[in-house]
Amino acid sequence: MSKIFVDACFGKETPYTPVWMMRQAGRYLPEYMRVRAEAGNFLNLCHDPKKACEVTLQPVDIVGVDAAILFSDILVVPLEMGMDLKFVTGEGPKFDDPIKNEADLDRLFGGDEAASKLTYVYDTIKLIKEQLAEDKALIGFTGAPWTLATYMIEGEGTKTYNICKKMMYSNPKLLHKILSKVTEVVKFYMEKQIEAGIDVVQIFDSWAAAIEPSKYDEFSWKYMVEIADYLKAKYPHIPIIMFPKGIPAFLDKVYGNFEVFGVDWSTPMDLAKEKLGERYVLQGNMEPCRLYSKEETTESVESIQKIMGGKRHIFNLGHGILPDVPVENAKHFIKECHRVSKK
């Protein structure tokens, strides 16, 4: 059975424009909160294939999205490379011993050795595929090497990225070594996700906007493209979505062998279409806070549909759904995307 979502990724004609939401398996769903409470904490949930499978499937069953996205976290990659990851309540993820020099980097596992430790992710994928409806796609994902490296170097989330940027400008050789090592792990990681059964790959560069546009290709995009090239050579039937958040200034310079470009909410959809619409399918890009109002949601969905015309497009939010959004409003978003695009 063909999957509408996969067809849309390849720019094929579909009966309506498919839709999913970043962070769709998340805290706005009471059912998710129940499973997370049973798991004890977020990381336990990521490590438990049965529970991770359950929360992956929840938004498909409850909200009606056209694709499931694997429930996991981008930081399982540095965790299995050998870094000590903790999630601190109210503060987010922390690494106790961030990378300061080459010796710190050399201590970490690389390539297939690190990727082979992520068996709980691959087991989760296999469980999901057993239970996911045949017409629904499963999206696997990874953080981009730059986004992963920011946590590995800073030790936690940051607003300034000054430790990373100090390295970028004063010791770029070391930063490139870190990015290269992470890239090799991610290649094997995504390959193993594909072998386990995912239908689509998304690469999240959540902190793309931390890099000045003239340096973005050198320190992030080229590594994302390297991963895409590696996967495309082996798995041409698996579409790849690139999502660099918050860099409209880079639209003119986008290149690479992938199918879908994720547009965040700060980039006007008509601008993205003008710059990239002929080369790539576009995904996005409703402002997530519009979900607080059904009227605002309808207005945005209709506006995006008018720009895209139901062609070479996947509906999504321009970032993740927020925890206090009413479930009814999320359902309304999905229904409206289907309504306005039905052919």
UniProtKB/Swiss-Prot annotation:
It is found in: Cytoplasm. GO terms for biological process: protoporphyrinogen IX biosynthetic process from glutamate. Pathway: Porphyrin-containing compound metabolism; protoporphyrin-IX biosynthesis; coproporphyrinogen-III from 5-aminolevulinate: step 4/4. This is Uroporphyrinogen decarboxylase. Substrate binds at R23, Q24, A25, G26, R27, D73, Y151, S206, H319. HAMAP family: URO_D. The keyword Plastid does not apply. One of its GO terms (molecular function) is uroporphyrinogen decarboxylase activity. The keyword Cytoplasm applies. Belongs to the uroporphyrinogen decarboxylase family. CDD domains: URO-D (cd00717). GO terms for cellular component: cytosol. It is an enzyme of class 4 (lyase). It catalyses: uroporphyrinogen III + 4 H(+) = coproporphyrinogen III + 4 CO2. Keywords: Cytoplasm, Decarboxylase, Lyase, Porphyrin biosynthesis. Homodimer. The lineage of its organism: Bacteria, Pseudomonadati, Campylobacterota, Epsilonproteobacteria, Campylobacterales. Its EC number is 4.1.1.37. The record marks D73 as: Transition state stabilizer. It holds the Pfam family URO-D.
